[in-house]
From Swiss-Prot:
Organism expressing this protein natively: Pasteurella multocida (strain Pm70)
Family stated for the protein in its record: Belongs to the flavodoxin family. MioC subfamily.
Keywords associated with the record: Electron transport, Flavoprotein, FMN, Transport
GO cellular component, one term: cytosol
GO molecular function, one term: flavin adenine dinucleotide binding
PANTHER family: NADPH OXIDOREDUCTASE A, NITRIC OXIDE SYNTHASE-RELATED
Pfam (any one): Flavodoxin_1
Protein name from the UniProt record: Protein MioC homolog
UniProt cofactor(s): FMN
Length: 147
């Protein structure tokens, strides 16, 4: 049986949600069990074994408001996540010096909790990428090959 993938989206204007929904459709077509969560709370996802976090960067390099509570609670929770495998897709704007800092935040926090990063994160510059769904789709095999 294929690995269940919990896709967690952090979005302010909807771009990350569109990417996540597109990736979820592709994974389902390939018979992966998928759980798509737009801004879940801690209890809803803490026991999942594989996270694909799709997030934009908001404000001064912060996580979007809809996933900030999840990662804030995780940061102060004593639970280690040695059983969790993860990858991150980030959307950002390279005009800002905080380009894709939300990706960095997610990576650093999950690694500090002993989670295993499956592959290099995808950092998309929305100034140059016109089709983020397609770009994420092109990255997806890199993620899947590590499951």
């Amino acid at each position: 049986m294929k690995t269940k993938i919990c896709i967690i989206t952090g979005s302010t204007l909807g771009g990350a949600e569109y990417v996540a929904e597109h990736i979820a459709e592709i994974l389902e077509q390939q018979d992966y069990p998928v759980r798509l969560e737009h801004g879940p709370n801690f209890e809803e996802v803490i026991d999942e074994k594989c996270w694909l976090v799709v997030t934009s960067t908001h404000g001064a390099g912060e996580l979007p408001d809809n996933i900030k509570p999840l990662f804030e609670k995780l940061a102060f929770h004593p639970k280690q996540l040695a059983d969790l495998r993860f990858a991150v897709i980030g959307l950002g704007n390279s005009d800002y010096d905080t380009f894709c800092h939300a990706v960095d935040h997610v990576e650093q926090l999950l690694l500090s909790k002993d989670a295993l990063q499956l592959c290099e994160s995808l950092r998309m510059d929305m100034l140059t990428i016109t089709d983020p769904e397609h770009t994420a789709e092109q990255w997806l095999p890199q993620f899947l090959s590590q499951l």
